[in-house]
Amino acid sequence: MPEITVRAKSKTYPVYINEFALEDIREKWTKSLAKFSHVFVLTDGHVAELHKAKLDAVLADLPVVTYYVAPNGEEAKTFRVYEDVMTKMIETGLDRKAVLIAFGGGVIGDLGGFVAATYMRGIPFYQVPTTVLAHDSAVGGKVAINHPLGKNMIGNFYQPEAVIYDTQFFATLPERELRSGFAEMIKHALISDLTLLRALMDTFTEPKDFYTKDLTPFLQRGIEIKANIVAQDETEQGVRAYLNFGHTFGHALEAYGNFGKWLHGEAITYGMIYALTMSETIYGLDFDLAEFKTWLEQLGYDTTFDASVPFSKILENMRHDKKTTFNEISMVLLEEIGKPVIFKADDDLIFETYKRVMRKGGNVI
């Protein structure tokens, strides 16, 4: 089975990825899980309904397994749900020899990792992602919950024991979710490899391709790109910030929409267009943005922003971005495809770029 090794400073661990990953790793994994006092599975209602039986079959021989079913979507990454999960773990009697399995998409992985990092000052956990989007979030150890003023503002760096990525789960994903996850695949290509970007653009030309074309080699390449960056900079003191390409504006948009109006990948797509536009202004980026946007539209993405989004709110949310220091907003831009840089953007540039990408010039309120 294809296996990618993540060599972070704090831990080295495998990412298992293929269409039958859970079955292929079952014997080895259950032997490891049997060493723990208790297995605590964190999932959400949607994943539990569709896939709990599959995980149950894998965990059937383990003596003590407890499930916690969180709300669907970003609602799960709140203080309220975080506290409720902790309460359930304490009431169930989980000790420091327990293990947590985050079974779901990126939200569950973020929440589950943060719970594991903070319960009794840290217990081991496994990532078992079920979405395309989670190929990015499940790898690298970033774990967090949201604050009303910003996405992922309360978090930690905490690596899993392993990532078990069974791509069979994709068959039940709605098109909108697949498209959201695909945005992170595009991001990895933009920051690393023009050839990879061209391969994506040539292979995926309409929404049905998300179901009929093989995503796995592109997911593997994206994970390898991220693993290489994490090996250099686990805690985002330097090059790991490049993985935030499109996220400064994208996270600001998500926060404005109360983490519900846009899916993460939808917001990040807007953010990448914003960053590419600013890259043209600052670095003269040689890239056919019009062709790129046409391709995105063919895949079903919206590439122009709702003009009701007020600039003042976006700017305020961008100031809450984790890369912002001394009140200076840091943008990940591209000098060329595959060559990202950090750029301190002033308010005038942020506003001028905003006007260029917003439908009808935006709302300056």
UniProtKB/Swiss-Prot annotation:
Entry GO MF terms: 3-dehydroquinate synthase activity; metal ion binding; nucleotide binding
InterPro entries linked: Dehydroquinate_synthase, DHQ_synth_AroB, DHQ_synth_fam, DHQS/DOIS_N, DHQS_C
Top-level EC class as recorded in UniProt: lyase
Required cofactor(s): NAD(+); Co(2+); Zn(2+)
A Gene Ontology cellular-component term: cytoplasm
Residue positions binding Zn(2+): 184, 247, 264
Subcellular location: Cytoplasm
Catalytic activity: 7-phospho-2-dehydro-3-deoxy-D-arabino-heptonate = 3-dehydroquinate + phosphate
Binding positions (NAD(+)): 106-110, 130-131, 142, 151, 169-172
Protein family according to the UniProt entry: Belongs to the sugar phosphate cyclases superfamily. Dehydroquinate synthase family.
Name of protein: 3-dehydroquinate synthase
Source organism (scientific name): Listeria monocytogenes serovar 1/2a (strain ATCC BAA-679 / EGD-e)
